[in-house]
Amino acid sequence: MITVVAKLQAAEGKQDELRAALEEMVGNVKQHEAGKATMYSLHTSDADPTLFLFYEQYASQDAFDAHGQTEHMKAMGAKLRGLLAGRPEVERYTQIAGV
């Protein structure tokens, strides 16, 4: 199981546009990657509503690799330009225990 945590900060005045784009991304993953992305959850910070966090889990390395190569993810990369205050912070984790 591969886990990814990504933080995205909205550019000034772009919070609503970014949120809409990220919600669209969740819908595309749900529609096109069912069974590969076992968790793809979007959150916003309680302390800073311009800060968004994705919590993602993938069934395998192949599923994770395929996610980045989908047409909807490639299109989203272009859409996010101008909506972010900087580069997303992305960290990858490997699950070692859980219930």
PLM feature spans:
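Short, well-ordered beta-strand segments in beta-rich or mixed alpha/beta enzyme
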Residues: I2-Q9, M39-G68
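Short amphipathic alpha-helical segments
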Residues: K14-T38, H72
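Alpha-helical elements of the RecA-like P-loop NTPase motor core of helicases
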Residues: D16, D62-D65, K74
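Short, flexible helix/strand-to-coil boundary loops that buttress conserved ligand/catalytic motifs
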Residues: L22, G68, G77
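Acidic-histidine catalytic/liganding microenvironments
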Residues: H32-A34, Q61, T70, R87
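Glycine-rich beta-strand-turn "strand-cap" elements at beta-sheet edges
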Residues: M39-T50, M76-V99
